[in-house]
């Protein structure tokens, strides 16, 4: 039963225990295992794993991301190919007809980026959710976020995932935010750009 289950679920641990590293199909490695064992893959099958990562960039290989959280993905800054591929492979959990315009707090109390290990930082969760939600918006709100500030600014992120992470994490902030100013500026922005009602954010 155990062997049948392992085969059907395509778990990688039996191959690892049998030292069959070069026989591993990284396209089938589950998302959690891909994160947990990536250093072991590099250590025991450096050439094969390197080819796999290069394939992610070219689009000839694939990665799974169904069981990882956005903040777990952006912590892989030392594996940019894997991070980018897993980010793009994430399922879309935003219901139809719902959209979020993120207001991101990047103040010092939120911690820091790039920890890689250790406790999850609130900033990592804020940045990852902000990017995840903003890129799913429509019209002028796609890739847009609002700074946590007394004078909130509507800003865009662009480039690859690392570039967007940096842009959002280094945005200007203050000790408090003016919610009324956010709504006022949102209304002015929508009127100026003739945004349709169905393209307006439903949540902030």
Which residues fall in each region the model found?
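Long lumenal/extracellular ectodomains of secretory and single-pass membrane proteins
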Residues: 1-125, 135-204
């Amino acid at each position: 039963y155990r062997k049948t289950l392992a085969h059907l679920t395509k778990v990688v641990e039996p191959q690892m225990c049998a030292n069959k590293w070069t026989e591993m199909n990284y396209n089938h490695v589950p998302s959690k295992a891909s994160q947990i064992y990536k250093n072991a893959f590099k250590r025991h099958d450096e050439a094969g794993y390197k080819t796999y990562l290069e394939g992610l960039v070219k689009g000839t290989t694939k990665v799974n991301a169904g069981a990882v959280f956005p903040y777990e993905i952006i912590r892989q800054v030392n594996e940019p190919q894997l991070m980018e591929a897993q980010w793009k492979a994430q399922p879309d959990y935003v219901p139809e007809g719902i959209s979020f315009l993120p207001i991101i707090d990047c103040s010092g109390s939120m911690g820091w980026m790039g920890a890689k290990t250790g406790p999850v930082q609130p900033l990592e969760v804020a940045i990852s959710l902000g990017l995840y939600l903003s890129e799913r918006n429509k019209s002028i709100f796609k890739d847009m976020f609002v700074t946590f500030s007394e004078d909130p600014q509507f800003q865009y992120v662009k480039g690859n995932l690392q570039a967007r992470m940096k842009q959002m994490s280094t945005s200007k902030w203050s000790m408090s935010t003016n919610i009324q100013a956010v709504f006022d500026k949102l209304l002015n922005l929508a009127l100026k750009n003739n945004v349709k009602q169905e393209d307006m954010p439903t949540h902030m």
